[in-house]
Amino acid sequence: MKPKTFYNLLAEQNLPLSDQQKEQFERYFELLVEWNEKINLTAITDKEEVYLKHFYDSIAPILQGLIPNETIKLLDIGAGAGFPSLPMKILYPELDVTIIDSLNKRINFLQLLAQELDLNGVHFYHGRAEDFAQDKNFRAQYDFVTARAVARMQVLSELTIPYLKVGGKLLALKASNAPEELLEAKNALNLLFSKVEDNLSYALPNRDPRYITVVEKKKETPNKYPRKAGMPNKRPL
């Protein structure tokens, strides 16, 4: 996808980009490729592929009407090079975005990126999702949690649901639909007082299938969740 195609597709969906936003995406691409030489951020470095499979793919929650352009608090777990939250932040500057990542090198990249792109209202923390979720400054503080290709729902729910306010939503972006994954996660979702509200399917402009599972938090998460770092993965609920 050429950058111009990216701009045109957004304009067609009533999301025209300003010159500043176009420059932000362009600089994002440049820094991603430059830093990818030093630390492993992505296997995708071809410009047209980055615009399609990282930038366009990341803004799917906005294109699907799931996220409003308001000062809402969004947490991105395991964002890697900033996907999906930072492309959404460029599009919707009102969003207040927090990223937690377990690799300090990636956090360094994200801090530089935010500085270069002049993004305000972005916060980066180095550490494990399981640990921050027990901190009252993070627990039950967010309207949305996003996770793009992070883990199976059975594991992901325990890592993310505790961060949501009651009524808040987890948006899990995936490249493959796995109905059995949601069946496996049924027990975990019940224990975490949360419920699958929707499982959206759509396609990228090149026809690659994509899915977003929307999970709503119905009641406060019991204090014992999430368990200690590593446990959700080792022994899923």
Curated annotation (Swiss-Prot):
Compartments in which it is found: Cytoplasm
Matches recorded under InterPro entries: rRNA_ssu_MeTfrase_G (IPR003682), SAM-dependent_MTases_sf (IPR029063)
Keyword terms: Cytoplasm, Methyltransferase, rRNA processing, S-adenosyl-L-methionine, Transferase
Region (Disordered): 218-237
List of residues binding S-adenosyl-L-methionine: 78, 83, 129-130, 148
Enzyme class: transferase
Main location: cytoplasm
GO molecular function terms noted in the UniProt entry: rRNA (guanine-N7-)-methyltransferase activity
Function: Specifically methylates the N7 position of a guanine in 16S rRNA.
Stored PANTHER family: S-ADENOSYL-L-METHIONINE-DEPENDENT METHYLTRANSFERASES SUPERFAMILY PROTEIN (PTHR31760:SF0)
Protein name in UniProt: Ribosomal RNA small subunit methyltransferase G
Organism: Streptococcus pneumoniae serotype 4 (strain ATCC BAA-334 / TIGR4)
